């Protein structure tokens, strides 16, 4: 069963990163990829994972795109998770998010600690 969480992933030419990110949020009931006219196959990757692609004409920095998405998209879920395309939700974190959402307590927001990992090219 999918977890009632809406995921927003703002992108522009993120084909290199997007597949891994989308694989990590397959548990979420809806995923929105907010694109700014990518030319590298980003939208095709999003479609492969059945994410809804929404175009946003890029006219500013990431905060503007994020705020536009939060104000414009009609979410079906009370919980929203914002991710960059180069971020992934680890399996343990996905389980914790699902538990919090299913509990339905009075908490309205969470801070998720991040772990930074770097890979060498080649």
Describe each region flagged by the PLM.
Residues 24, 35-45:
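A conserved acidic beta->alpha catalytic loop
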Residues 57-64, 70:
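A short, glycine-/small-residue-rich helix N-cap motif at loop->alpha-helix starts
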Residues 78, 88-122:
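Conserved donor NDP-sugar-binding/catalytic core segment of glycosyltransferases
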Residues 67-79:
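Active-site nucleotide-sugar/metal-binding loop of Leloir-type enzymes
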Residues 60, 85-89:
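Acidic metal-phosphate-binding loop of nucleotide-sugar-dependent transferases
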Residues 27, 49-50:
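Short, structured coil segments at secondary-structure junctions
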């Amino acid at each position: 069963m999918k977890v009632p969480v809406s995921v927003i992933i703002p992108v522009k030419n993120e084909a290199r990163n997007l597949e891994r990110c989308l694989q990590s949020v397959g548990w979420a009931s809806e995923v929105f990829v907010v694109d700014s006219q990518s030319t590298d196959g980003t939208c095709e990757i999003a479609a492969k994972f059945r994410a809804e692609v929404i175009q946003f004409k890029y006219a500013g920095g990431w905060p503007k795109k994020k705020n536009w998405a939060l104000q414009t998209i009609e979410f079906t879920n009370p919980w929203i998770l914002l991710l960059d395309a180069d971020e992934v939700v680890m399996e343990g974190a996905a389980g914790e998010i699902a538990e919090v959402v299913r509990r339905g307590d009075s908490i309205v927001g969470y801070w998720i600690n991040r772990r930074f990992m770097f890979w060498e090219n080649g």
